[in-house]
Amino acid sequence: MAADEKAQANGEQAKGKVKKVVGGAAGNESLKGKGHAEESKGDLRAAKEKAKDAIKRK
């Protein structure tokens, strides 16, 4: 996994988790939803990079 892509994925996941927690605590469903979406985006980016690494190994 490229280091910059991995860092970006981890950053998106962390930001998403924070937004979900803050949105849930504040009762802000919009922020909570945006956090969930951002966390999912980070998860997908990480999965994409892992798949690319697996293909390169073969």
Curated annotation (Swiss-Prot):
InterPro entries linked: CsbD (IPR008462), YjbJ_sf (IPR036629)
Region called Disordered, residue ranges: 1-58
Basic and acidic residues composition-biased segments: 31-58
Superkingdom field: Bacteria
Pfam families: CsbD
Family statement: Belongs to the UPF0337 (CsbD) family.
Protein name (record): UPF0337 protein SAV_738
Species of provenance: Streptomyces avermitilis (strain ATCC 31267 / DSM 46492 / JCM 5070 / NBRC 14893 / NCIMB 12804 / NRRL 8165 / MA-4680)
